[in-house]
């Protein structure tokens, strides 16, 4: 049975349990699917693997979906949008870029975007970055969490853009990653959402070695950190 299209309106019961939507396809024609829980006014958008060679966030977000389904009190007064695999082309090919060789996290319509061979022909030239932009426009999230991994030799950290300092520090209370303001990358989702739209956005930079962990180990290591983002400013239970 296919997932419903993005434009279809699910029932309240289905939204409570997590409604899947196909929101479009990648440049390589792979469906991109989000899961939406609830329909409350406090909105959190969590995405992973916009860089396909940073895969650890995908099983972490999928485990988050399982946790929400078994703890439906998290949905009270909230909408939670999960995008476990933002760059399926790169994920399959184990590369940073999509199938067209574009770094999706340099393809957003941010005021600091620069033209380069790997940033796309123009802002939002890629279907994946357009899809993420459309999700933001439709749901107007109160906060965005984008899961990444640092490169070999670089320590993991919690980066942020826009008015997200307090959120980043709250998340840091539940894991061993420090808050480290890395600076707004040109054309990144952080720059677009945090600086242009003034939406608090955290770039959660996990460690390179986290790719070697099982899904359960990832959840034990970082699950409560994601829950802290969802329940912010209330502490997670």
Question: How would you describe each model-predicted region?
Answer:
Residues 33-42:
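Short beta-strand-to-loop junctions in surface cap/lid or active-site-entrance loops
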């Amino acid at each position: 049975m296919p997932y419903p299209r993005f434009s279809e309106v699910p029932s309240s019961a289905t939204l409570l349990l997590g409604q899947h939507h196909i929101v479009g396809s990648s440049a390589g024609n792979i469906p991109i699917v989000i899961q939406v829980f609830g329909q409350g006014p406090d909105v959190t958008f969590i995405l992973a693997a916009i860089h396909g060679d940073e895969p650890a966030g995908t099983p972490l977000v999928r485990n988050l979906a399982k946790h929400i389904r078994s703890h439906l009190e998290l949905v009270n007064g909230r909408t939670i949008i999960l995008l476990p695999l933002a760059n399926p082309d790169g994920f399959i090919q184990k590369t940073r870029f999509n199938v067209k060789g574009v770094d999706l996290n340099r393809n957003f319509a941010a005021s600091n975007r620069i033209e380069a061979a790997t940033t796309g022909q123009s802002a939002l030239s890629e279907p994946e970055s357009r899809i993420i932009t459309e999700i933001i426009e439709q749901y107007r999230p109160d906060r965005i969490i984008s899961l990444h991994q640092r490169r070999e030799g670089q320590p993991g950290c919690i980066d942020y853009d826009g008015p997200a300092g307090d959120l980043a520090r709250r998340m840091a209370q539940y894991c061993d990653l420090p808050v480290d303001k890395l600076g707004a990358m040109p054309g990144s989702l952080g720059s677009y959402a945090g600086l242009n739209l003034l939406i608090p956005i955290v770039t959660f930079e996990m460690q390179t070695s986290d790719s070697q962990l099982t899904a359960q180990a990832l959840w034990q290591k970082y699950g409560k950190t994601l829950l802290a983002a969802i329940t912010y400013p209330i502490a997670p239970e």
